[in-house]
Amino acid sequence: MARTLTALGESFPLATPFRISRGVKTAADVVTVTLSEGGVIGRGECVPYPRYGESVESSIIEIEAIREALESGIDRRVLIDMLPAGAARNAVDCALWDLELRLSGSDIATAMGLA
């Protein structure tokens, strides 16, 4: 079945600025990944950190670079070799977990042997 990918950047203003010693954050800049297959949707997200050389834009570029593989049906085990550890891989990994479990009718607790 055909799978489709959407990767979008979103910015959510914080009600109160978050202050720490190295700066102030006034919004949560998030990348949201949606994978859909056969009417079933899996979602994942990440918050890229400039401290680690990440941005919303760079994360989306990393995700778009593997669009063909994602849409052709790779699973999360293959993803580990396709993207380096970081925000982009986290968002895609979460979307793949969510999609896999929804397609199988299972849940994370059962998949992890906790239920």
Each predicted region: which residue ranges?
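N-terminal capping/lid subdomain adjacent to the active-site entrance of alpha/beta enzymes
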Residues: 1-115
